[in-house]
Amino acid sequence: MKKLIDTLKNIWKIEDLRQRILITVLFVAIYRFGTKIVLPGIDYNGLDKLQDQTATGLMSLLDMFSGGAFSHASIFALGIMPYISASIVMQLLAVAVPYFQKMQREGESGRKKISAYTRYLTVAILLFQAPSYLFNLKFQVGPALASGIDWPVFMVPATIILAAGSMFILWLGERITDKGIGNGVSLIIMIGIIARLPNAFFQEAGSRFAAATGGGLVMFLIEIIILYAVVCASIVLVQGVRKIPVQYAKRVVGNKTYGGARQYIPLKLFAANVMPIIFAQALMFIPLAIVQYANPQEASWFTRSLMDHQSWLYNVIFAILIIAFTYFYTAITLNPTQMAEDMKRNNGFIPGVKPGKDTAEYIDTVMSRITLPGSLFIAFIAIMPAFAGLLDVKQEFAQFFGGTSLLILVGVVLDTLQQIESHLLMRHYDGLLSSGRIHGRGGVAAY
């Protein structure tokens, strides 16, 4: 405990880190305040039906990603997911279309162009999604519109406000990334999820304690133990690495000898972090956006199954998408050929493997071997809420038994802590984590 207190004091001593944390807290507070502002023209007291609708099914998950803004007809109701959807499309285009491939190879200028295209596409998606949300709002809470306002008159300004709200959230996320601590977009999603956790916890506790059959306390304690075990497993998954030994040749410069030491390349078991989960979840929201233009009761069995995140069809497709996006995102994040060239340029080699092409193939083989079990495990954890629901765990609490919510929480928290850790170690302070090193198969590798 004393070490933790000393570390927190050290964080406060570092002016740059202190300012980054305060800026992050400020922007997060602005985001949470915005989720409470209801669209102009909506009577808040008439939103009960919408909140009942978002209490179950896929809408409850979408409401959690928006921090409760979706069910409260907030100006931030559409959240950050339209931007995530646009990012998916642009990353696919960067792999499949030569024009965008060339742009991606242009370095910083190319990334700025792709970022601009992503924003334009986000606006286009918002111009589709905002009316979709408003049509659903009319179907659910038509009487909640303030008297004297017609829906046709309400639609245009409401669409603009919803689109502007989402773009403002994106701006907040980018400012957090640039001037704050952590990945801004992921942090905003995580804050929305955390906002739902206390209510879900107390609902489940109240349900178990009120059970007429008795044994509610025991069942609730078992649930907490299982939840703790799943959290630990998720942390191991996110932190796990496979280290490839690298030997550097000795160089004599003047009277001094350099190199000759053995180091490691730490390949993470789940190199893609939380992005495949967020991307897969964004795609699973598409049927919901489409069906909002019509009465959900008139949708086909297939569409209704995709809207129920506890159905077998939804979970099978969701798991497949996570596995596919894990491979895709790992492939665009790690470049074995570039790693092999950098190693060769610095007189490094993997023992028993020829430098150059053979080294690139070896790294690619190792990545394929560790990505498969990692993606399967992450997909299993992602669909665990469906199994929790079968055991009579309340749906809102079941979403934290693995699932997208827990994986995002674990991934974002660890990523943010590691960024704080790097600031502390750079200034020769002890870090928040137990060590400034990565542990995994093959020994210890320095950052």
Ranges and model annotations:
Residues M1-Q104, S109-Y447:
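N-terminal cationic and glycine-rich segments that engage phosphates or anionic surfaces
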